[in-house]
């Protein structure tokens, strides 16, 4: 029952508890530790997780995977002193940007992909690309506000890589996905 609830939420943003349906518009991030020996996207990184997370049906609903081992471990040199951005202020801005559909519209206009591309792969890549656009280029209000090369390097390519890790992991537990790649996205010519 928990599996179906989680899959439903991840797919449609709805949760059914008893006879009551609730709609949510929040996403969520799952955090976890992977044994250091398995920190390799070309190995099955999910095998030690609970069985709920080792099904391709649930994994396919995960948009992307951030390789935490590429993020530097916190150390004294990373701490700041003096002026800083207040995290509550930053969180408020991110919350406001969540409702701004301009960024997704820009992504939809900028990218093209094969007509037969997998819907979940396409949606995951577009959502992650939109998130990168909001985070890294919050000033962008139209396609002309960002260079295609920057959009590709900092938004689209990282999003495709994050989704490809999920697809690769699914291929290790379900033959249906073995050797599958995410769709090729191209940036429309608009300059």
State where each predicted segment sits:
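A short helix-turn-beta junction within AAA+ P-loop NTPase domains corresponding to the substrate/partner-engaging
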Residues: 41-73
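Conserved AAA+/SF3 P-loop NTPase catalytic/coupling segment centered on the Walker-B
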Residues: 1-9, 33-43, 57-58
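Short, flexible/disordered intra-domain loops and linkers
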Residues: 1, 39-48, 75-82
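Structural recognition of the conserved hydrophobic beta-strand(s) that form the central parallel beta-sheet
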Residues: 21-42, 64-67
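Conserved Walker
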Residues: 11-26, 47-53
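C-terminal engagement/docking regions of AAA+ P-loop ATPases
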Residues: 146-191
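Hydrophobic/aromatic-lined pockets within catalytic cores
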Residues: 7-15, 70, 137
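Conserved AAA+ ATPase small/helical "lid" subdomain
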Residues: 27, 63-152
């Amino acid at each position: 029952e928990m599996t179906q609830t989680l899959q439903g939420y991840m797919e449609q943003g709805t949760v059914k508890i008893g006879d009551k349906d609730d709609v949510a518009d929040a996403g969520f991030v799952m955090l976890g530790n992977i044994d250091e020996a398995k920190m390799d996207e070309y190995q099955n990184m999910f095998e030690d997780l609970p069985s709920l997370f080792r099904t391709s049906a649930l994994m396919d609903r995960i948009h992307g995977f951030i390789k935490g081992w590429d993020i530097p471990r916190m150390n004294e040199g990373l701490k700041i002193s003096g002026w800083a951005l207040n995290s509550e202020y930053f969180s408020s801005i991110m919350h406001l940007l969540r409702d701004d559909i301009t960024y997704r519209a820009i992504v939809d206009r900028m990218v093209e992909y094969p007509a037969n591309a997998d819907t979940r792969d396409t949606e995951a890549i577009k959502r992650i690309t939109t998130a990168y656009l909001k985070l890294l280029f919050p000033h962008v209000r139209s396609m002309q506000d960002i260079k295609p090369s920057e959009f590709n390097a900092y938004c689209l390519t990282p999003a495709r890589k994050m989704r490809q890790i999920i697809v690769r992991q699914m291929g290790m537990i379900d033959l249906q996905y073995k050797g599958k790649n995410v769709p090729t996205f191209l940036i429309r010519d608009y300059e």
